[in-house]
Structures are given as C-alpha cells and as structure tokens.
C-alpha cells in the first residue's frame, strides 16, 4: 500500500484459483478444505505476533511521558504470577530501553510493559487503530478483535502485549496501521482501481487520494518510525 495515497499496489492470498475456469472448478472450490476462495489478506484473522508491539509501544508512550527513560534488563524470560514468557531462541537481550526492546522484539520486556499499562486505555488505543471497528475496504474482510477490559488477567495482558492471546487481525488491517505510521499518523482511504475508462479509452472516473482518519499524532508516528 502506498502510504501517502492509499493505493493498494499488491495483494496476495494463497492458495489461489484460476478465475478463467471458476465455473468449471466451482464444485471443488466450494468444498476445498484449503478454502481457496477465502481472501486471507483481508478475511484471514490471525494473532498479530510481534507486529502488535507497535500498538503496545504507542500505548506506553501515551501513558508515560518519560517513555524515553524506560529501562529493562532482559534475562531471556519473565515470570509473573506463575506465567513465564520466553524471548525467541531464549536469547537474553540484557539492558534495553524502549527503542531497543522493539528492535530486539523482546518478549520479556514487552510483557513487562503490558503489566504497566492501564487496561481501559490500552483498549481505547487499540480501537483508535480500528480494532473492533469497521475498516475502509471495498472487499469482504474480517473485523479485527482486541479483547481487554478491567477483568483481563495479568497473564492475558502479558500475552496480549506481545501479540498473542485473544487478539486477532488481518494482514490488510496491519498494513493500514503501518501505512498510517509511515504517513505521519494519517490513514488514507485505500483503493484498488486508479481510474476507469470507457470503450474509447476516455477516463470516466478517477480515484483521488482521500484522508480516511487520523489514527495517531504526527509526533507519535515519527517516534514509532524512528524505533522501527
């Protein structure tokens, strides 16, 4: 996606099918266990994994004005109330600030950050990034889910902070969030068709870039870009 305009430049879903023979293939397509007709880019709902650490970082920045002073010593894992979260490959990252934690994709540090966040504020930030909400899309899509409230356990928060737990998102939605960060916090309305021509080759309709919504401040976006 071109962040400054909203143009969708590429979209892929596997397994695929041949649209030229869809009539002949319809029976097996509709019974295919691999769901070839499902556009996984927009309709797939997956745990976001470490990409969600951007959301956790944003919430921490909003709650703690001194976020640049964050410090954590990673020993490859963190244990809290019986729940242990390991870093990938059991790697110990040592002393980290917030930028280091994101660069290292440190699960221990982000689990620690998750425990420091206000749950309702965390949910509000996620919803400002269009979780639990409609997405700008002309294609069928799955609504992303963020399930955190005052009753969410610390164990669940630790998992949520690193992109696991009950959180679900489509690749398309994660692209929208990333594009907004790249575009200074502003999400442009995505579109697939640049323009439409009639049989003479005359342009009868042209899509132009249009702001959809501001998801974060330009300062927040700039800091996330710096950390990325």
Give the location of each predicted region.
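Beta-lactam-recognizing serine transpeptidase/beta-lactamase-like catalytic domain environment
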Residues: 2-50, 55-228
């Amino acid at each position: 996606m071109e962040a400054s305009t909203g143009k969708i430049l590429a979209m892929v879903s596997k397994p695929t099918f041949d649209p030229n023979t869809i009539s002949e293939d319809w029976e097996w397509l509709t019974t295919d266990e691999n769901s070839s007709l499902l556009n996984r880019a927009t309709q797939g709902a997956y745990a976001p994994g470490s990409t969600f650490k951007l959301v956790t970082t944003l919430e921490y920045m909003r709650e703690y004005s001194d976020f640049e002073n964050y410090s954590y010593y990673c020993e490859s894992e963190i244990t809290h109330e019986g729940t242990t979260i390991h870093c990938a490959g059991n790697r110990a990252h040592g002393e980290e600030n917030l930028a280091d934690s994101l660069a290292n994709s440190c699960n221990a540090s982000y689990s620690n950050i998750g425990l420091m966040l206000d749950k309702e504020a965390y949910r509000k930030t996620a919803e400002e990034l269009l979780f639990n909400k409609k997405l700008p899309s002309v294609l069928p899509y799955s609504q992303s889910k963020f399930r955190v409230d005052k009753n969410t356990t610390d164990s669940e928060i630790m998992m949520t902070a690193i992109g696991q737990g009950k959180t679900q998102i489509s690749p398309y939605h994660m692209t929208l969030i990333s594009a907004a960060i790249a575009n200074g916090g502003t999400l442009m309305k995505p579109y697939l068709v640049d323009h439409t021509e009639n049989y003479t080759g005359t342009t009868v309709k042209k899509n132009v870039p249009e702001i959809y919504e501001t998801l974060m401040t330009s300062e927040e976006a700039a800091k996330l870009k710096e950390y990325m």
